[in-house]
C-alpha cells in the first residue's frame, strides 16, 4: 500500500492523471502505458486516475460507466500491470469500502467535499483520501474537510485545488 510519505519522496511533485471514467480495459491500459512511458522518461512519479462510475453527469442518459466491479477490476489491473498506484472517485459512504478493495487512493469529488459521512467512510478504509476543493470554498475552508478525515483516524490526506467560482460558472484557477 502506498502512503503519503511515498508520494512526498518525489520532492512534492507527482502526476495524477488518466481518463475521466473507465470506458474499458483496453483504453485504460493504453492510456496508462503511454503516461508511464512519459513519466518514466521524465522521472516523475505517477498515479493513475480513473473514475469507476461517474455519478455527477448533466443528463440522466449520459454514460456513467461499464459497471462498478468491472471498472474497479480494470483499475486494479492497471495498477498491477504498470506498478503504479491508482485513484478513483467515490460518491457515497457505501462505496468507500468496496472501492478501497481495488485502489490505493479514494478521491472525494469537489462538490462532495463537505459531506461528513463520505469523508469519514473514506478515512475508515485506511487508504489515502484525496479531497478535491469545492469551487464554492476558500482554500482555508478545506482544513475542515481534512480535519474530518484526520479525526476519523486517518492522517493520509491530500487536497487538490479546483479553482474558485465567482458569479455564474466563472471559474478561476491558480496557474502554475
Regions from the PLM with identified roles:
Residues 1-15:
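N-terminal amphipathic alpha-helix/helix-capping segment at the start of soluble metabolic enzymes
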Residues 10-14, 42-46, 82-86, 102-104, ...:
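Short, well-ordered coil/turn segments that N-cap beta-strands
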Residues 18, 48, 99, 131:
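Conserved, mostly hydrophobic/aromatic
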Residues 19-27, 47-68:
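Glycine-rich, proline-tolerant flexible connector loops at the mouths of alpha/beta enzymes
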Residues 48, 174-176:
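Conserved small/polar residues in nucleotide/adenosyl-binding loops
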Residues 64-85, 122, 126:
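Alpha-helix-loop-beta-strand connector modules within alpha/beta enzyme cores
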Residues 67, 84-92, 104-115, 128-139, ...:
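Catalytic beta/alpha-barrel core
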Residues 126, 130-174:
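Catalytic alpha/beta core domains of metabolic enzymes, predominantly
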